[in-house]
From Swiss-Prot:
Transmembrane segments: none annotated. Involved in the replication of viral DNA. It is required at the very beginning of the virus amplification, conditions in which a low number of viral DNA molecules enter the host cell, possibly to recruit the limiting amount of initiation factors at the replication origins. Once the infection process is established and the other replication proteins reach optimal concentration, it becomes dispensable. Optimizes the binding of protein p6 at the viral DNA ends, thus favoring the initiation of replication. It comes from the Viruses. Belongs to the phi29likevirus protein p56 family. Homodimer. Interacts with the histone-like protein p6; this interaction optimizes the binding of protein p6 at the viral DNA ends, thus favoring the initiation of replication. The keyword Aminoacyl-tRNA synthetase does not apply. GO terms for biological process: DNA replication; viral DNA genome replication. The keyword 4Fe-4S does not apply. Keywords: DNA replication, Early protein, Viral DNA replication. This is DNA replication protein 17. It holds the Pfam family Phage_Gp17.
Amino acid sequence: MNNYQLTINEVIEIINRNTDINKLVAKKDNLYPTDLYDLDKQQLIAIILNSDFALSSIKRALLEVTVEELGEQDNDDDLDEIDSELYEDAEASDVPHETIVKVFEADKSIVTFNGEKLKHYVNVDVDNSSVDEVKKIAKEISEHDFNDEDIEEAELKTFKNHLPTIYSMKKENK
């Protein structure tokens, strides 16, 4: 990857294009954006370094420029490495390969995440007591009939129980 170094004129151009930085610089020492060309290099750097906002804006502008330039260099080896480290998920967004959960076909009970084996993985295809317990709980939950009226009634009771507290807090604040 190339090393990018800004000239003072490029920094001034970035500042001139960013109205928020212009306002910030104008407030500092009663300067106006056109006066930036008259500033000595050290003064300009001091103004920029003393402003977190100016620094973040310049970093953002530099990142945009760098990304644009990298995007134009398709034959760049670094880009090929980056592309090989990404895969496209179901939503068509790039995801690093390290975050893929891997299930080995030979033994589905072994699962890795970022290359580390996960110990607590339940294989629902295997018949044993812990899996049966999990299946039983899942079945009970799926068969349970959640009555909306009962839920609303419970919420209303909870609210009514808290009303005196809310009322007394309001009285105290007046």
